[in-house]
A protein has these predicted regions:
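Conserved Nudix-box catalytic region and its N-terminal flanking loop in Nudix hydrolases
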Residues: 24-36, 41-82, 151
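Short, solvent-exposed loop/turn elements at beta->coil junctions and helix N-caps
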Residues: 23-27, 100-106
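Acidic, metal-coordinating catalytic segment for phosphate/diphosphate chemistry
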Residues: 2-37
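A short coil-to-beta-strand element that immediately follows conserved catalytic motifs
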Residues: 91-100
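Nudix hydrolase/Nudix homology domain
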Residues: 60, 99-103, 110-177
């Protein structure tokens, strides 16, 4: 799909207001579009990925288990299932929607400008990271991530920090503490 990937433009309440290309949605100040982040857990630890150096935005930064955009005609769950296969070569079960936020994060001449839902769930299967998407992965406990964020906040994507903060405030976080 490349730069012709079509994304859903939304307002601050996630109401659809149109579509545009991925390139236009991330160029300059960007255009607000629909996205999600997903945290998957196994044995009380969350899967984190380190973004590929090939990424346009925040290459090499630590990120959520997987993340992407919701395409026209897709639900958040369908988008998460699609992306788990692309990024992790894995199938994930239903994920729980725990939080949403709107953010703008510029980097150079590009930016993220998204309405983002945070999805959380358990994962007990095998996976194979897609090297085009990520450099490495690690499993980490919530307390370990909190401590690392305090010491190395710039090592994480802006949406990771917002997603993690919202997740910690949600009742779902108690299940994984």
């Amino acid at each position: 799909m490349g730069d012709q990937e079509i994304l859903i433009l939304v307002d601050e309440n996630d109401n659809e207001i149109g579509t545009d290309t991925r390139e236009n949605c991330h160029s300059g100040k960007g255009r607000r579009h629909r996205a999600y982040t997903a945290f998957i857990f196994h044995g009380g630890k969350m899967l984190l990925q380190q973004r590929s150096r090939k990424k346009l935005l925040w290459p090499g930064a630590w990120d959520v288990s997987f993340t992407s955009h919701v395409y026209p005609g897709e639900t958040y769950q369908q988008a998460a299932s699609r992306r788990a296969l692309q990024e992790l070569n894995a199938r994930v079960g239903p994920l729980t929607d725990v939080y949403s936020f709107v953010y703008f994060a510029p980097q150079g001449e590009n930016a993220e400008n998204e309405f983002c839902r945070v999805l959380v769930g358990d994962f007990n299967g095998e996976f194979t990271p897609n090297a085009d998407e990520m450099m490495s992965v690690k499993w980490a406990g919530i307390k370990e991530v909190e401590a690392d964020l305090r010491v190395h906040p710039d090592s994480y994507t802006p949406w990771f920090k917002l997603s993690f903060e919202g997740f910690l405030k949600s009742p779902a976080s108690k299940r994984y503490a």
